[in-house]
Amino acid sequence: MWSLLLVPTLMVVYDFFKFPIDTLYFQNPMRPLCGIRNTFRDLIHFNSECSVKNYPGLMLIKFHFHKIKVEFEAVHPTLKKRYYHDVSPWFEKNENYYFYKIKDFPMLSSLVKQIPCIDTQVAAFAVSEGPMILHPHRAESNRLLRYHITIHGGGECTLYTESGSHQHAEGEEFIFDHSRYHELIKTGEGKRVVLILDVNR
């Protein structure tokens, strides 16, 4: 009987010890089951490349970049800021790091609904004002990949991931596995705005 538990136990251990270790891992009783699924997906996607070109629907976002930027500039001043520290215990209180949900941007919301690979649950414009560090972290599940396209760069700003680094420059897009290590270091004084979309693998 114990031998039957060995494989799922090893799968959970593998997921738990990914860097950075999530100190909240076992506070959620369902997290070990998520860990087993994560390890299974890691085996399936071993050595697979995270690339925007693998998701043709995302070309619509790039193609309409100017319209998306114009709509953001027109609409966001009318909206209330939503703070990341209010929705996740991982984030320290920081009133310079906030977001706007894309459901409040009619043109973009309509566009995203035309792209089947996008999961809209966390779709948002993420805004960071001034210098900032988001320390190494990772998502609970690897079911989704994370897509970024930069609306405003806001000065020197680099996202570091297991597969390399990405500069947040206006109009640049990037996709990565956010269940793996990533951190953000922003030394620029300006406002960085990034459209964040989750993509089904």
For every predicted segment, state its role.
Residues Q167-Y181:
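Conserved metal-binding segment of the jelly-roll/cupin
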Residues L134-H137, T158-Y160, F176, H182-G188:
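Short beta-strand His + acidic residue motifs that chelate non-heme Fe in jelly-roll/DSBH
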Residues L111-M132, R143:
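A short glycine-rich, His/Asp/Glu-containing loop-to-beta-strand
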Residues I151-E170:
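A short beta-strand-loop-beta hairpin characteristic of the jelly-roll/cupin
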Residues V127-E129, E140-C157:
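Short, conserved beta-strand element in jelly-roll/cupin
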Residues W2-I115:
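Non-heme Fe(II)/2-oxoglutarate
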